[in-house]
Swiss-Prot record:
The proteasome is a multicatalytic proteinase complex which is characterized by its ability to cleave peptides with Arg, Phe, Tyr, Leu, and Glu adjacent to the leaving group at neutral or slightly basic pH. The proteasome has an ATP-dependent proteolytic activity. This is Probable proteasome subunit alpha type-7. One of its GO terms (biological process) is proteasome-mediated ubiquitin-dependent protein catabolic process. It comes from the Eukaryota. Belongs to the peptidase T1A family.
Length: 253
């Protein structure tokens, strides 16, 4: 039974067959967006995002889609860009409020829970619409690294590896091959670049760039962009893999 076209997709209420179409449309916005991945390794977390360069007038590596929420927390979003910017701002407000009230950094699980609750509220009222973004939360604290993904309906889960966007299926297949328990941050940077190059659609002939951040032992627990030198090395590695030069790489190593 289909309820599309009968008005049930015009607001936030359930159709007779139990579907919430506005929430499903929010997922569609994410599915058609840039590929974003998160990798939780032994000593930290990597966030990586493919950004299509829509104009040659744009300054390279300036229009960031990954932001710091607190010193130890980073958030990457993919989907409807303004919604993602709002989610990052909301997360920063939550982190600031926690510090003001408790005098300590907000735990990763708390920020994920609060974002999930906030996003879920936008699926409950007819005067608003769901957020068309998937949010990746990367944190590092005394208990180690943590990676969460908050979905458009407010559900959030903890992950070792997560992917969303156009190339999500290819990315997930590649992530499943990784040994997260022994993977180091610098190696994870290379793997993240390789996976994003594997998901890139060459047919659209559009330039793209990779935005990547990390938090963990290598950064003394502070969320920062991956250094340019390391990112360029990782992208060169990914290009060689994409060009089918695996044997040459193995010989060099």
């Amino acid at each position: 039974m289909s309820s599309i076209g009968t008005g049930y997709d015009l607001g936030l209420f359930f159709s007779p067959d139990g579907r919430l179409f506005q929430a499903e449309y929010a997922y569609k916005a994410v599915e058609n967006a840039s590929t974003c991945i998160g990798i939780k390794c032994e000593d930290g977390v990597i966030l990586a995002l493919e950004k299509v360069v829509t104009s040659k007038l744009l300054k390279p590596r300036v229009n960031n889609r990954i932001g710091s929420v607190d010193r130890h927390i980073g958030i990457a979003t993919t989907g409807f860009i303004p919604d993602g910017q709002h989610i990052v701002k909301r997360a920063r407000d939550e982190a600031t409020s926690w510090r003001d009230n408790y005098g300590s950094p907000i735990p990763g699980t708390v920020i994920a829970d609060r974002l999930g609750n906030y996003v879920q509220l936008f699926t409950c009222y007819s005067s608003v619409r769901p957020f068309g973004v998937m949010s990746f939360v990367a944190t590092y604290d005394s208990e180690g690294p943590h990676l969460y993904m908050v979905e458009p309906n407010g559900v959030y889960w903890g992950y070792n590896g997560a992917a969303a966007g156009k190339g999500r299926q290819v990315a997930r297949n590649e992530l499943e091959k990784l040994n997260f328990s022994s993977l180091k941050m610098k190696d994870a940077v290379k793997e993240a670049a390789r996976i994003l190059y594997a998901t890139h659609d060459e047919e659209n002939n559009k330039e793209h760039e990779i935005e990547m951040t990390w938090v963990g032992v290598e950064t003394n627990g502070i969320h920062t962009p991956v250094p340019d030198e390391l990112l360029q090395e990782a992208e060169a590695y990914a290009r060689r893999i994409a060009d089918g030069e695996e044997e040459d790489i193995a010989m060099q190593e």
